């Protein structure tokens, strides 16, 4: 059956700021306390969506979450009106305010793990929300992510959206950022490659930075998503590269159809893994980048592998890269050699995503890939599909509500909370989502 990959991109939220919340993500740590520009961040993301949509790659948008997230501050013992809660936490424990104001939901590669209908036992598209257990600020995302996905994939005959796994370290799950699908045409059954960093009883794990994904979580997600057991491989990421800042697999590898583009040191037991994939995926092609040409450090600093590998109708592929790759002579030199070599990659497309990159999120972090048949695509909430009208509407919305300068101190401004709620109220109507945010369901108000 014919099917296409639709990229659902996360829209950057109004409180996008640099707080260095993500230990193990070196860009996040390096840019801590810099001044951010939420308006520019949102527009950079929108331009990527629109440019790819115009090039014939189906695109959709996933909206931001409510931030600062007052209910969690109340759980932490801060009381009073919303304004009083903000004032107290800013004075007594500003690190909590930064955490509950993170715009990290924009990296929707961590929102969920997807199983296309061609791979599932019941013939539905399955989406399992990620619990993002390893980082407090990200562990807050799952309930609203679930509401948003159910509002977008709202036809229960075609889509099953599963709640996140229990919030315990043993079941730490980071979503599609640690998941690859390999195969032929999108509508054919594919091989799902789940990548984990640690498993219970196995001492092979990183020592400097945390391994966020467990094998136990990956196995549970595969079960929830009803993936045919004959179409699953579990592989461990190389713990040495996690210790060099590769906090998700999508920082060291990207797949599309029959191609796996990865660093030579991406996986533990990589030779055996690639042999297994060759045996089980027709036409499988591994493009391994040698450490002598691109070091792991350079891969992390440029986000070479946090790229999007997109298929054209003729079978050729486009590699979507952040501007940092073009600015690094060694990486750009390698990429031009890659273009000239015998492989499906025929074009490099570069985007300026500096606002997201400075927090450790490149092109691939910003998108959730969902393979859909034509019938399934028709069943998606049409209001989220990117086109000329939506692009203009969202740019106007960003101009109206987003600030062009934000520091950690600004997060205590009650006006920022009010602006955010008003903006999301309007956005949920524009995207026909219903009441997906807690402030809407509580009768809301702005105070």
Swiss-Prot record:
Pfam family membership, one: AstB
Q: Provide the residue positions that the database annotates as binding substrate.
A: 19-28, 110, 137-138, 212, 250, 359
Chemical reaction(s) catalysed: N(2)-succinyl-L-arginine + 2 H2O + 2 H(+) = N(2)-succinyl-L-ornithine + 2 NH4(+) + CO2
Q: What is its EC number?
A: 3.5.3.23
Answer whether the UniProt record assigns the keyword Hydrolase to this protein: yes
Keyword annotations: Arginine metabolism, Hydrolase
Single GO molecular function: N-succinylarginine dihydrolase activity
Pathway of action: Amino-acid degradation; L-arginine degradation via AST pathway; L-glutamate and succinate from L-arginine: step 2/5
Q: Which InterPro entries match?
A: AstB_sf, SuccinylArg_d-Hdrlase_AstB
The Gene Ontology biological process annotation of the record reads: arginine catabolic process to glutamate; arginine catabolic process to succinate
What positions constitute the catalytic site? 174, 248, 365
- Entries under NCBIfam families matching the protein: arg_catab_astB, PRK13281.1
**Functional description taken from the UniProt entry:** Catalyzes the hydrolysis of N(2)-succinylarginine into N(2)-succinylornithine, ammonia and CO(2).
- Oligomeric and partner information: Homodimer.
Family from the record: Belongs to the succinylarginine dihydrolase family.
Question: Can you say what this protein is called?
Answer: N-succinylarginine dihydrolase
The gene designation is astB
